[in-house]
Amino acid sequence: MSFMSEAFKYLAASIAAGLAALAAALGNGKVISKTLEGMARQPESADNLRATMFIGVGLIEAVPILAIVVAFLILFL
């Protein structure tokens, strides 16, 4: 392979992983802030909100994990 195609592979992998991490960080921040807002408004529903928040954060975190898998596929295939 040429030098440029190898360089573009590394660039594409880093952009994919970086943007996914940025989007997940923003999404997690939004979910957690809104959950804390809801807990402050209705403290009696804190347990339900916390459980729902953990499920949401887990689903959001699945996106960067998949992006890292795609980045590795770009690099090694």
Swiss-Prot record:
Q: What GO MF terms are annotated?
A: lipid binding; proton-transporting ATP synthase activity, rotational mechanism
What this protein is called in its record is: ATP synthase subunit c
Q: Where is this site: Reversibly protonated during proton transport?
A: 61
The superkingdom of the source organism is Bacteria
List the Gene3D superfamilies: F1F0 ATP synthase subunit C
Q: Which UniProt keywords apply?
A: ATP synthesis, Cell membrane, CF(0), Hydrogen ion transport, Ion transport, Lipid-binding, Membrane, Transmembrane, Transmembrane helix, Transport
Q: Which PANTHER family match?
A: ATP SYNTHASE LIPID-BINDING PROTEIN, MITOCHONDRIAL (PTHR10031), ATPASE PROTEIN 9 (PTHR10031:SF0)
**Known role:** F(1)F(0) ATP synthase produces ATP from ADP in the presence of a proton or sodium gradient. F-type ATPases consist of two structural domains, F(1) containing the extramembraneous catalytic core and F(0) containing the membrane proton channel, linked together by a central stalk and a peripheral stalk. During catalysis, ATP synthesis in the catalytic domain of F(1) is coupled via a rotary mechanism of the central stalk subunits to proton translocation.
InterPro entries per UniProt: ATP_synth_csu_bac/chlpt (IPR005953), ATP_synth_F0_csu (IPR000454), ATP_synth_F0_csu_DDCD_BS (IPR020537), ATP_synth_F0_csu_sf (IPR038662), ATPase_proteolipid_c-like_dom (IPR002379), F/V-ATP_Csub_sf (IPR035921)
Q: How is this protein organized at the quaternary level?
A: F-type ATPases have 2 components, F(1) - the catalytic core - and F(0) - the membrane proton channel. F(1) has five subunits: alpha(3), beta(3), gamma(1), delta(1), epsilon(1). F(0) has three main subunits: a(1), b(2) and c(10-14). The alpha and beta chains form an alternating ring which encloses part of the gamma chain. F(1) is attached to F(0) by a central stalk formed by the gamma and epsilon chains, while a peripheral stalk is formed by the delta and b chains.
What gene is this protein a product of? atpE
Membrane-protein topology: Multi-pass membrane protein
Enumerate the HAMAP family for this protein: ATP_synth_c_bact
What does the UniProt entry say about where the protein is found?
Answer: Cell membrane
Similarity comment: family membership: Belongs to the ATPase C chain family.
One cellular component term (GO) for this entry is: plasma membrane
> Which Pfam family is an annotated match for this chain, by its short name?
ATP-synt_C
Question: Known SUPFAM superfamilies for this protein?
Answer: F1F0 ATP synthase subunit C (SSF81333)
Membrane-spanning residues:
7-27, 57-77
